[in-house]
Amino acid sequence: MILIGDKMKILIRIGFILIFIGIFIFSFDKVQAYIKDTKEVTITNEEKNAKLEDVSYNIVDDNELNYNPQMYANKYDKEILTRDNNEDYKIIKIQGTTIGADYHYEGYMAVIYDPSKVKIAKSTGAGITENSYGQILSDISKNNNAVIAMNAGGFYDQNWNSNGGIPHGPVIIDGKIDTDYKRGDEGGGIIGFNKENKLVLKRMSADQAIAEGIRDAVDWGPYLIVNGKNQFKDVNYYTWVCGRTAIGQRKDGIVLMLVIDGLQKHSKGASYADMAAIMEKYGAYNASNLDGGTSTAMTLNHQYINSPWNGYRRTIRWLPNAWIMEK
């Protein structure tokens, strides 16, 4: 019985040893498999990361793709929209050949990015009496601390003395009627900005303009572009050239002020069709002709940038009012 008991103990011990060895071998295989799998996963992720890095590099390499995020409708649109971040305006040199003729013209376009800064300023002596008088554009600019100034509405030239004192038709300044002289032959229309800073072209009275929210306006014409439609597509119409002035606005709100020198060696002048075509090229949605001829003038910081011509008179023409860009 003792021998049997001893044998049983030995067998039990051997059994435990075999079980322990089996567990150890099984666990070791599992550990090896786990380590192997982990290595394979690590290698796979490294390969994937390498591929992702290659793809990302190809996407963000602007030089390789030659990608330009800013798109323009045409070269004129690019000329308007290319500017420094803090630039309130820019001046573009304009030159070309008249439509239907072979006359060279030159001038300037002022591009104003904030339409709320575009206002009407008047001569200190403008009024509706015989002793009213105008001022040259540079003086109007100085008196109103303007960055840019351009002649605006016409005037009644009594006795052909060019004193520029009595404005033609309604003049509205800061939402109020400044003058509204009617002689009976007014043939233009309102050219002005409303309180939403949109250029409005409409034949209406001064009172109607105030009722429709016009803040600054003069009376003149003809209208060049109305709601995107060029009014002078017929090249045989109004081909007479001289100094010209116009104002327009793009759909994005940018204001365009345009002057073309006339009756001079460097610039014969432009027609209404030319002015409409220039405004159309630069994206004007609405645009109108203003007083031109010897009145055509533009200043930058009170200095003339175009070449005003006043016939054979010694002085630059006096004006009743001007479109200005405030500081």
Model-derived regions, located:
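Structural recognition of the beta-strand scaffold that forms the well-ordered cores
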Residues: 111, 147-151, 191-192, 200, ...
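Zymogen propeptides
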Residues: 2-182
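Active-site-adjacent helix-turn-beta-strand microarchitecture at beta-sheet edges
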Residues: 155-236
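Short glycine-rich loop/turn motifs
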Residues: 104-109, 187-188, 241-246, 320
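Conserved, well-ordered active-site substructure
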Residues: 160-181, 233-285, 290, 295-327
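Structural signal for glycine-centered tight turns and loop->strand junctions in beta-sheet-rich domains
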Residues: 116, 197-199, 253, 294
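Short, glycine-/Ser/Thr-/acidic-enriched flexible segments
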Residues: 115-117, 155, 206, 262-264, ...
